[in-house]
Amino acid sequence: RICPRILMECKADSDCLAQCICQENGFCG
């Protein structure tokens, strides 16, 4: 999957860019 390396806070996968997923630490990855 393609995930830009940008530190983004999230609550759900939809908060993240591209194919990033929301990880347990509260950040996209």
Swiss-Prot record:
InterPro entries associated with the record: Prot_inh_squash, Proteinase_amylase_inhib_sf
Molecular functions per Gene Ontology: serine-type endopeptidase inhibitor activity
Site location (Reactive bond): R5, I6
GO cellular component: extracellular region
Entry's localization field: Secreted
Function according to Swiss-Prot or TrEMBL: Strongly inhibits trypsin, weakly inhibits chymotrypsin.
Disulfide bond positions: C3-C20, C10-C22, C16-C28
Keywords: Disulfide bond, Knottin, Protease inhibitor, Secreted, Serine protease inhibitor
Taxonomic source organism: Cyclanthera pedata
Family statement drawn from the similarity comment of this UniProt entry: Belongs to the protease inhibitor I7 (squash-type serine protease inhibitor) family.
UniProt name for this protein: Trypsin inhibitor 4
Domain notes: The presence of a 'disulfide through disulfide knot' structurally defines this protein as a knottin.
